[in-house]
Swiss-Prot record:
It comes from Corynebacterium efficiens (strain DSM 44549 / YS-314 / AJ 12310 / JCM 11189 / NBRC 100395). Its cofactor is Zn(2+). The gene is cysS. One of its GO terms (biological process) is cysteinyl-tRNA aminoacylation. This is Cysteine--tRNA ligase. Belongs to the class-I aminoacyl-tRNA synthetase family. The keyword Aminoacyl-tRNA synthetase applies. GO terms for molecular function: ATP binding; cysteine-tRNA ligase activity; zinc ion binding.
Amino acid sequence: MTLRIFDTATRTLREFIPLKPGHASVYLCGATPQAQPHIGHVRSGVAFDILRRWLLAKGLDVAFVRNVTDIDDKILTKAAEHGRPWWEWVSTYEREFTWAYNTLGVLPPSVEPRATGHVTQMVQYMQRLIDNGFAYEVNGSVYFDVTAWVAAEGSDYGSLSGNRVEDMEQGETDNFGKRGPQDFALWKAAKPGEPSWPTPWGEGRPGWHLECSAMATYYLGAEFDIHCGGLDLQFPHHENEIAQAHAAGDGFARYWMHNHWVTMAGEKMSKSLGNVLSVPNMLEKVRPVELRYYLGSAHYRSVLEYSEGALTEAAAGYRRIEAFVDRVGEVEVGTWTAGFEAAMDEDLAVPKALAEIHNAVREGNSALAAGEMEKARELAGAVRAMTGVLGFDPVEWGTQTDDSAAHEALEVLVHAELERRATARAEKDWAVADEVRDRLAAAGIEVVDTADGVSWKLQ
């Protein structure tokens, strides 16, 4: 069967035809590491990890680029508020994001470029836009001229988001000398105390949108297959990426995919609303593989409404799969069902794919009860193939029953130690607090103190 994906740009299901036969090129807008990652952040990573795994399963060679926005207004503000160097702040939370992705079984990207490492490419991109008449310099800043681009032949500005140009305002704070309210910064002139890099237009730092256009085309070429990201990036970020790229003469992304939000009580999960659930906090409730199962269980274009009940139900669903594979014993990866393939080829319809997995588990348990071991092994092999595509094959995760019990026991023991440490810190008994931390470190357990609380991970 042929994979069809929902292309946000055309608002239609389109057959995926790679630019280069046998290869797929994918760019995912990654982290802006300003704070601890929450499950809204990592849902995007899990959703498009499933896309990547399915492309690989269909025999394609996949170049997967996931960037890090390591210079940004919010990063500078957060670092300044806490009296920390911006680069230290970024490095701290970049490690947190990497840990979260790895813990949830997200495959590492082919390359993970940082914005600050690609200023040369950004300068070249800006020069092309200026030469083409779609960017201008004012007092050391460089802006994209939206009015000029909209008037140009072939312009499609606003088509991705559906916004009307006359209703758009970019919200740039440093807008002195801008020709129009819709114009956005490609390069921001240096301010005292802020990091900056030299350019032909003076010292400064990159604008958010320019970073991704420059990095995507540098690694994947002027035209590539799929650009992914969260729905909240559709405007202004992705709309402006397209404008820059097309104005520079690049074909850019041929398909656009956006995952929906994680919500709580109907509200989008965000730091500003104070309704975030950090990954470490979630891992106090369920195992990493169960959290991955939960985050990937809804269709990527659907809202995932968080509740304790839904999380518990998802964890129980995974354990049913795990228990069946454990009962069968050692089994090789088999072949997925036709229904599973049809579901995945229809815009990654994971809920339907999960139904196929659970049907196989039910049939397999019935086969075991009837003593039909050959049939049970065949079904377990199919389950391994299907769960492998979704990134939670129980055998690959090593989460058989004994390991689960050991993990739960470890959780209890570490939690007790952390409570003892918290009590000591509250009483300013630093010697005891340090003793607990050092004892855990000697056992290979790293204690992580963050603004959202304390968490732990195996070193």
